[in-house]
């Protein structure tokens, strides 16, 4: 993957990861989609209907390829947010929050995946649509006393979720099934 739009364009590559939401999954994962972003999205940006009207209008392209927090804006249950590493694009159903520091990104990821925020979102967002408006209204209380602990626990959660995600053959970083590590099915999952 690329670390910036310029790097993506200079690479000459065609396909890049894209956040499009997905099923309930906290901390990491739902990395399922690729998008044709060759030549800075030339084909997508020029895509027109039969009347010549533009059908696609990518937004906020300066934020493409940055790390952030992504989530599925439509959910029938609890909101789940995930770490999105550098190198991904995003679209409307796979929104992304961006931060000026990785420390704040990780801290806020811990906050938004908490039970407290879930209860708050029941008031701010009583429907199944967790779009940017209600998410942007979430109050962020920064506890400097607890920040190191929260960041450490969130990193552990991301790593555990990434290991789980990568144990499936559909993961781009798949190496080996968990079943291979155990002598039988019970041993593989205990």
Region spans (language model):
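Polybasic, glycine- and aromatic-enriched phosphate-binding surface used to engage nucleic acids
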Residues: 1-159, 163-183
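Polyanionic (Asp/Glu-rich) segments that form extended negatively charged tracts
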Residues: 188-190
